[in-house]
Amino acid sequence: MQNQVAQSMKNSIKVYLVNSFTRDHCGGNPAGVVLNPPKLTTEQKIAIAQQVGFSETAFVYSGDDTDFKVDFFTAEGEVDFCGHATLAVFFTLSSLKLLKPGDYSQKTKAGILTVTINHDNIVMEQTLPITRKGPCVNDVAKALGILPEVIEKTDL
């Protein structure tokens, strides 16, 4: 992973620019990391994510019942979880010597997940994916003449 720092123009918020899944500091999947930001509205987080310009930006807070609370934002809104941004968060915390090797818990919209920092890597826990069995929602919606979102809201 590699790490750079950028300043958000608004509110002088420090954003770490981190590439996860790199080899020899090349390539990877970029994410923004904001550590202990001031109280921000959803709109402000979206604006920062837009300014960062990566697929996700993580906002990291001290947790009440976990080690950390992490919010993930895209340029369009909040998402439940982001794997490469999670790795970016813990790489940043470790690089800044704020964390030692060990197990840490993070609260996300996807639930409470464990992240393990080792001397040479970071491993994260993810919830099992939800798989849907049955006909394609888009096909059913088209046949019924309704929007797919109507069916998706039912969780069927």
Regions found by a protein language model. Give the residues of each.
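Active-site proximal loop and beta-alpha junction motif in alpha/beta enzyme cores
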Residues: 3-81, 87-156
